[in-house]
Amino acid sequence: MPRYAQLVMGPAGSGKSTYCATMLEHCQALNRSVQVVNLDPAAEHFEYPVIADIRELIQVDDVMEDDSLRFGPNGGLIFCMEYFSNNFDWLEESLGHVEDDYILFDCPGQIELYTHLPVMKQLVEQLQQWEFRVCGVFLVDSQFMVETFKFISGVMAALSAMVMLEIPQVNIMTKMDLLSPKAKKEIEKYLDPDMYSMMEDNSVALRSKKFSKLTKAICGLIDDYSMVRFLPFDRTDEEGINIVLQHIDFSIQYGEDLEVKEPKEVDEEPSNSNFDAFFQDTADS
């Protein structure tokens, strides 16, 4: 029987630990067995129980205090993750082997781990050898994504992780519950974006012809291949959380021995149908 894993990624402060705590609580309400593993050696606290904690193997503070290494916070974290990649047997022993395992891996926030360093790719390959079906869950803070150029930056980060790890990936805008009604209405266009229209709306801000061409080329790549779209995540909205879980389960074929159904939100114009309920509170604003 296969095992299942969500690799919860994203920049620092994007809400990875909150996502794990919320998803764990939601799955428990559905009587689904889900466990969490902390892979952030710099974590100070989190709101969920774990079956494995990388800090039992190595901690950033210990590395930084080692006079022979002389690492700062970022270098110390990279060292910890490289040490972890050489000690996957610790993770295997911590996980054990139970059929139908469903694990959430709460990962560090250093973006270079998902763009050009091999550590997370090695983790994915190791999990696959242990018969895990792995889905990347890339989080971005919705409060950061309300401007077109910031949105493009977030899309490129998500796309880099997708290309690097070569696994199914679901991209999520977190902290939707913290947005004002006006901001919710504004951000709807970024969930399933028309990149060309967005660029036309912001063409005045592109003063440099060289960078204007580059930005338009990037937007064209994203739009033409439909590579990146986002789902909203509001920790107070059980239906919205379930929609996210459906998409992830579908991508890794969770429970394939049962009748697997495609998530109801997968259709041609999701922005007009998927999120009506979520944004109904903005209709009168």
UniProtKB/Swiss-Prot annotation:
<feature type="site" description="Stabilizes the phosphate intermediate; shared with dimeric partner">
    <location>
        <position position="74"/>
    </location>
</feature>
<dbReference type="GO" id="GO:0005525">
    <property type="term" value="F:GTP binding"/>
</dbReference>
<dbReference type="InterPro" id="IPR030228">
    <property type="entry name" value="Gpn3"/>
</dbReference>
<keyword id="KW-0547">Nucleotide-binding</keyword>
<feature type="binding site">
    <location>
        <begin position="13"/>
        <end position="18"/>
    </location>
    <ligand>
        <name>GTP</name>
    </ligand>
</feature>
<dbReference type="Pfam" id="PF03029">
    <property type="entry name" value="ATP_bind_1"/>
</dbReference>
<protein>
    <recommendedName>
        <fullName>GPN-loop GTPase 3</fullName>
    </recommendedName>
</protein>
<dbReference type="GO" id="GO:0003924">
    <property type="term" value="F:GTPase activity"/>
</dbReference>
<keyword id="KW-0342">GTP-binding</keyword>
<dbReference type="InterPro" id="IPR027417">
    <property type="entry name" value="P-loop_NTPase"/>
</dbReference>
<feature type="short sequence motif" description="Gly-Pro-Asn (GPN)-loop; involved in dimer interface">
    <location>
        <begin position="72"/>
        <end position="74"/>
    </location>
</feature>
<dbReference type="InterPro" id="IPR004130">
    <property type="entry name" value="Gpn"/>
</dbReference>
<feature type="region of interest" description="Disordered">
    <location>
        <begin position="262"/>
        <end position="285"/>
    </location>
</feature>
<comment type="function">
    <text>Small GTPase required for proper localization of RNA polymerase II (RNAPII). May act at an RNAP assembly step prior to nuclear import.</text>
</comment>
<keyword id="KW-0378">Hydrolase</keyword>
<comment type="similarity">
    <text>Belongs to the GPN-loop GTPase family.</text>
</comment>
<comment type="subunit">
    <text>Heterodimer with gpn1. Binds to RNA polymerase II (RNAPII).</text>
</comment>
<feature type="binding site">
    <location>
        <begin position="174"/>
        <end position="177"/>
    </location>
    <ligand>
        <name>GTP</name>
    </ligand>
</feature>
